[in-house]
């Protein structure tokens, strides 16, 4: 494309190439809208079709996964691995198992992952993968057979210096273990090709907690910079999975009163706030095969908002930790009307562009996911470092490194987001991540 083209021309070009990939188009629009003024001031980043290369994955692998269920019936699922950008290191990003998974969602996640990984300062490129397989309601044997069948194709595209996947929605330690085991068998090589592994075979302490902990570390830094803090604040958390659970735990440790958790069926509201004992029970319920927050609400006699999200509950801080586009403009209006002070994304792109704009216009502190939830992939990078050195660090060391990385990410966001009373963290995160990747791409020529 012409280096002098407008923002809308560029976005139309992206939309025209993939007209049905709405999630991916949304992610590109969000990033490029904040980048464009910076690009106009720094035209060297328009050279060598850099932007066109940046929004096109280096490689997309699509394949079928054929497996047998417990009734000995043949099941067929689709799977993908999007190897988006390797300019600063091997592709790095999770595997997602959920019926909603499609190529558009994985491209959006891989695109976001590229900038997120760059923000960590660790040498990791961006990638993402997954399948429309739904692990919910499946037996452990069915999950294992699916994971093993998937790896019979995927293994040939992975390697410690090529592509290192991890977990995501629907993929926890169990699934990572099944996939890593099959990879080892097929490749006859025990090198690190997955992160989020169990401690018994190369996993890192703090990795399960890292995304939730990192979210709170970043949010606390953002609050402190503006004369606030978690102490005494009412917090709404959406979701009740891994990220939400550890975000609740760390927010409580910082003195917050967390009053909500949710799943796809509804929201539990606890005005007295979670306690360590209550959180432990929620984790037990969610770990069961069909556990729901409704079960938790009934057990403790709490308010349950069936079919609703947490955003109608008056809070000071909102931490969306469930899924993309869960917080729309109507929910944003309610949060703002109820006096919300800060919103930080624990999930990937959980806030719509319109809602994000509304928060920024209202002066609400807003932390985008590529910065706020980078703790998970940062600790994955630390797991890779431990594996490469044949070492296992103590939990305190990993947690300290995680905290330091999140503070560095916050500093980078402030540097590029405007060092004033209200930093634009969306702009700061996008520019900081972009500069790291773009400089590497320009230095390596047209490839």
Curated annotation (Swiss-Prot):
GO terms for molecular function: glutamate dehydrogenase (NADP+) activity. One of its GO terms (cellular component) is cytosol. This is NADP-specific glutamate dehydrogenase. NADP(+) binds at residues 211, 242. Homohexamer. InterPro entries: Aminoacid_DH-like_N_sf, Glu/Leu/Phe/Val/Trp_DH, Glu/Leu/Phe/Val/Trp_DH_C, Glu/Leu/Phe/Val/Trp_DH_dimer, Glu/Leu/Phe/Val_DH_AS, Glu_DH, Glu_Leu_Phe_Val_DH, NAD(P)-bd_dom_sf. The record marks 168 as: Important for catalysis. Keywords: NADP, Oxidoreductase. GO terms for biological process: glutamate biosynthetic process. It catalyses: L-glutamate + NADP(+) + H2O = 2-oxoglutarate + NH4(+) + NADPH + H(+). Catalyzes the reversible oxidative deamination of glutamate to alpha-ketoglutarate and ammonia. The active site is at 128 (proton donor). Substrate binds at residues 92, 113, 116, 167, 380. CDD domains: NAD_bind_2_Glu_DH. It is an enzyme of class 1 (oxidoreductase). The keyword Oxidoreductase applies. Belongs to the Glu/Leu/Phe/Val dehydrogenases family. Pfam families: ELFV_dehydrog, ELFV_dehydrog_N. Its EC number is 1.4.1.4.
């Amino acid at each position: 494309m012409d280096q002098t083209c407008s923002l809308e021309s560029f976005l139309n070009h992206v939309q025209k190439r993939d007209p049905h990939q709405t999630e991916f188009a949304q992610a590109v629009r969000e990033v490029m809208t904040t980048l464009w003024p910076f690009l106009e001031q720094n035209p060297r980043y328009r050279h060598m079709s850099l932007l066109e290369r940046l929004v096109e994955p280096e490689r997309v692998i699509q394949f079928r996964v054929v497996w047998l269920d417990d009734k000995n019936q043949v099941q067929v699922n689709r799977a993908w691995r999007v190897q988006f950008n390797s300019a600063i290191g091997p592709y790095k990003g999770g595997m997602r198992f959920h019926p909603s998974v499609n190529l558009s969602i994985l491209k959006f996640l891989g695109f976001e992952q590229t900038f997120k990984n760059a923000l960590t300062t660790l040498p990791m490129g961006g990638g993402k993968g997954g399948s429309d397989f739904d692990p919910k309601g499946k037996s452990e044997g069915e999950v294992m057979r699916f994971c093993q069948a998937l790896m019979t194709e995927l293994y040939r595209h992975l390697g410690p210096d090529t592509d290192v996947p991890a977990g995501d929605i629907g993929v926890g330690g169990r699934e990572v273990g099944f996939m890593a085991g099959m990879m080892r068998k097929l490749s006859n090589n025990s090198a690190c090709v997955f992160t989020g592994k169990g401690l018994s075979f190369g996993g890192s302490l703090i990795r399960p907690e890292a995304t939730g902990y990192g979210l709170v570390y970043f949010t606390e830094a953002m609050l402190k910079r503006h004369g606030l803090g978690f102490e005494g604040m009412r917090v709404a958390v959406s979701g009740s999975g891994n990220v939400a659970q550890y975000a609740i735990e760390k927010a409580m440790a910082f003195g917050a009163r967390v009053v909500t958790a949710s799943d796809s069926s509804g929201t539990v509201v606890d005005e007295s706030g979670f306690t360590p004992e209550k959180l432990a029970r929620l984790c037990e319920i969610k770990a069961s095969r069909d556990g729901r927050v409704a079960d938790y609400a009934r057990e403790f006699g709490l308010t349950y908002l069936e079919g609703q999200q947490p955003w109608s509950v008056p809070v000071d801080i909102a931490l969306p930790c469930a899924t993309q586009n869960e917080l729309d403009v109507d929910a944003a209006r309610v949060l703002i009307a109820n006096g919300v002070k800060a919103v930080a994304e624990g999930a990937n792109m959980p806030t719509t562009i319109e809602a994000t704009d509304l928060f920024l216009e209202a002066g609400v502190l807003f932390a985008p996911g590529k910065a706020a939830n980078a703790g998970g992939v940062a600790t994955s990078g630390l797991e890779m470092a431990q594996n490469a050195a044949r070492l296992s660090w103590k939990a305190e060391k990993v947690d300290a490194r995680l905290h330091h990385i999140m503070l560095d990410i916050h500093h980078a966001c402030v540097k590029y987001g405007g060092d004033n009373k209200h930093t634009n963290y969306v702009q700061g995160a996008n520019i900081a991540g972009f500069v790291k990747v773009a400089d590497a791409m320009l230095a390596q020529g047209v490839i």
